Swiss-Prot record:
Keyword Lipid metabolism: yes
GO biological process terms, semicolon-separated: fatty acid biosynthetic process
Catalysed reactions listed for this entry: holo-[ACP] + H2O = apo-[ACP] + (R)-4'-phosphopantetheine + H(+)
Name by which UniProt lists this protein: Acyl carrier protein phosphodiesterase
Protein family per UniProt: Belongs to the AcpH family.
Reported function: Converts holo-ACP to apo-ACP by hydrolytic cleavage of the phosphopantetheine prosthetic group from ACP.
EC nos: 3.1.4.14
Keyword annotations from UniProtKB, A to Z: Fatty acid biosynthesis, Fatty acid metabolism, Hydrolase, Lipid biosynthesis, Lipid metabolism
First-level EC class: hydrolase
PANTHER family per the UniProt record, alphabetical: ACYL CARRIER PROTEIN PHOSPHODIESTERASE
Domain of life: Bacteria
Length: 193
């Protein structure tokens, strides 16, 4: 899962949206640096990452990547799940339009920015103003996201080519998304994530 899915599942679970978004920028035990609700959100994010990576649908999808891109498949798939969530938002969350949800999420996350790591603050400078969460529905934007990550981290250069794996398996990936994401939503609503 990437930014949008983590925020969405956190909302369904009444968990800290701030903690769920911040989690990738925090190493080790967050309890000494953040309030309890944010800490709980960080831990929820970590549990979701482990759970998602071990879902049969996701493990199957990783196998569809070519040898040269399989190493980055988990990252590429996380971004792709956000694509499907953004694309199908009106079906998934008919009572909370995406633009309104993004505004709500932004307001929640903004409260922790003064005490956040600089890299997280930098992400937030772009995430909201450039409307990344809404733009995830556009596959051209997904390609830009993958290229941007590859530019920032040369070790992940294979992300550029992983675009072709997404394109080649788009329909099958979308089908897998519909298999597992509604289950995760139900688990979030039961506070079982």
């Amino acid at each position: 899962m990437n930014f949008l899915a983590h925020l969405h599942l956190a909302h369904l679970a009444d968990s800290s949206l701030s903690g769920n978004l911040l989690a990738d920028f925090v190493r080790g035990n967050p309890a000494t640096h953040y309030p309890p609700d944010v800490v709980e959100g960080i831990y929820m994010h970590r549990r979701i990452d482990v759970m998602t990576d071990n879902l049969p649908e996701v493990r199957e999808a990783r196998e569809w990547f070519r040898h040269e891109t399989r190493r980055v498949a988990p990252i590429t798939l996380d971004v792709m799940w956000d694509h499907f969530l953004s694309r199908h938002w009106t079906q998934i969350s008919p009572d909370f339009p995406l633009q309104a949800f993004v505004g709500y999420a932004h307001a929640q996350v903004a409260t922790i920015l003064p005490d956040s790591p600089p890299r997280f603050v930098n992400l937030n400078d772009y995430l909201w103003s450039e409307k990344w969460l809404e733009r995830y529905r556009d596959m051209d934007f997904i390609q830009n996201v993958l290229n941007g990550m590859a530019n920032r981290r040369p070790r992940l250069d294979a992300l550029r080519d992983s675009w072709y794996d997404l394109d080649a398996h788009y329909d099958a990936l979308e089908e897998r998304f519909w298999h597992f994401y509604p289950r995760m939503m139900a688990q979030a609503a039961r506070k079982a994530l």
